[in-house]
From Swiss-Prot:
Summary of subunit composition and partner proteins: Homodimer.
Pfam families xref list: TAL_FSA
Species: Opitutus terrae (strain DSM 11246 / JCM 15787 / PB90-1)
Gene for this chain: tal
Record localization: Cytoplasm
Catalytic reactions on record: D-sedoheptulose 7-phosphate + D-glyceraldehyde 3-phosphate = D-erythrose 4-phosphate + beta-D-fructose 6-phosphate
Location (main, coarse): cytoplasm
Entry function: Transaldolase is important for the balance of metabolites in the pentose-phosphate pathway.
Protein name as it appears in the record: Transaldolase
């Protein structure tokens, strides 16, 4: 019988580590792991992972661009993570390609080729792409090539609908960043059940199950343990080590909140978006527009910092 909340949660939700810290993964035994440029940058600056930076620089060769070294570094981190977790790792495409469909596809193929060179099959990789119109179109084509994608920076229902229609493998609707925006915008605090980020994932999960979409829903970006518990039953939840620790430290009961059978009976209408209506709906959602652009800028800035780190290490 599971004792702590983490073990209880694992009974009906796949737990994923939102981290590049190998030690925390060994402690909490998630099935999958997610990385992003910010997490890789943080890890790359730590002594424990310096050898991976050195290996990426050496193996890429003196003539390689900083971008090529970073590609290899992401893959080396991912390959190490896959020695710990039994499932999949998510590796992110350079955020500066968020509005470049062709460039995103080329980068994804490069990352997959590098993984396969490390002996990692593509079935264990999810390529993360920003949930822009261009990112979703890139993912649609990549899925047809057998490259599984994880749509990140997803803050709105239209983004989720477009991703499902494109038959992407998985989406990562953000929870905490939505809460951040609403708290700042309204000055209010929200009870866990009324958390706007939680409500967003609940709506998406219900829609997907109601209409039989196979795209997996992985709630992401949590600010507190209560947000996680309100989404117990979601397909997957990617959780930072601090919150994994809080769940593991509590023995309070965990109640399943999201049920596929209940969702299939929900009275919701099927909707569809072409490019024009997608862009308009996203633009009409101030929160989603601001958080998407903020997220892209932030990840792009961390990629640039990684490039600077590579240049410094090269001397």
């Amino acid at each position: 019988m599971p004792t702590n909340q983490l073990e209880q949660l694992k009974q009906f939700t796949t737990v994923v580590a939102d981290s590049s810290d190998f030690d925390s993964m060994k402690s909490y035994q998630p099935r999958d792991a997610t990385t992003n440029p910010s997490l890789i940058l943080k890890a790359a600056g730590m002594p424990d992972y310096g050898h991976l930076v050195e290996k990426a620089i050496t193996d890429a060769g003196s003539g390689a661009s900083p971008a090529a070294v970073i590609d290899l570094l992401l893959v080396l981190f991912g390959a190490e993570i896959l020695k710990i977790v039994p499932g999949r790792v998510s590796t992110e495409v350079d955020a500066r390609l968020s509005f470049d469909r062709v460039g995103s596809m080329e980068k994804a193929r490069t990352l997959i080729a590098l993984y396969e060179k490390q002996g990692v099959p593509r079935e264990r990789i999810l390529i993360k792409l920003a949930s822009t119109w261009e990112g979703i179109r890139a993912a649609e084509k990549l899925q047809q090539e057998g490259i599984n994608c994880n749509m990140t920076l997803l803050f709105s229902f239209p983004q989720a609908v477009a991703a499902a229609k494109a038959k992407v493998k998985l989406i990562s609707p953000f929870v905490g960043r939505i809460l951040d925006w609403y708290k700042k915008s309204t000055g209010q605090d929200y009870a866990p059940a009324d958390d706007p980020g939680v409500n967003s994932v609940r709506e998406i999960y219900t829609y997907y199950k109601r209409f039989g979409y196979e795209t997996e829903v992985m709630g992401a970006s949590f600010r507190n343990k209560d947000e996680i518990l309100e989404l117990a039953g979601c397909d997957l939840l990617t959780i930072a080590p601090k919150l994994l620790g809080e769940l593991a430290a509590s023995t309070d009961p965990v109640e399943r909140k999201l049920e596929p059978e209940a969702a299939r009976k929900a009275k919701v209408k099927r909707v569809s978006f072409d490019e024009k209506s997608f862009r308009w709906a996203l633009n009409e959602d101030q929160m989603a527009t601001e958080k998407l652009s903020d997220g892209i800028r932030s990840f792009a800035a961390d990629v640039r910092k990684l490039e600077q780190l590579i240049q410094q290490q090269r001397g």
